[in-house]
């Protein structure tokens, strides 16, 4: 049985060129990007296919060779892969559930702070040369987030990181999750 691994769109994973794929064994073939036709050609005889945000439809999966046993999505989301079609073909799909948890949570908090401070409106004023918002009286409203209530849907890795940062900002937390815990530590579970 082939142990070959094919990374079909490494460019999506290595956008900052920090990864050194050259240290991988000869059993791992790495391609910067692949069209669907190239992908099918390149994975012939492969056991594992590694992708990053590449659409893998039922139609594309129907062309996969029988040697493929595993598709690895090199990120958290795997909605780009037709899971039912993969299952029918006997291909396991896995992802990296804790990948960039902090970055995603920080982006959520950044958006909250952006809206609370009407940052986009203020930037727009500055771009036009309007500095009236920075005089004695603010022309654009600003809302403090401390004491405000944040609703979080899902208390997985990302949700819990959002909660941690929001609590540090003094926010009250309501959480809806499939696996609620007892209220406490500044968190109230709701349904």
Question: PLM features: what roles do these ranges have?
Answer:
Residues 2, 68, 146-149:
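Phosphate-coordination loops involved in phosphoryl transfer and adenosine-cofactor binding
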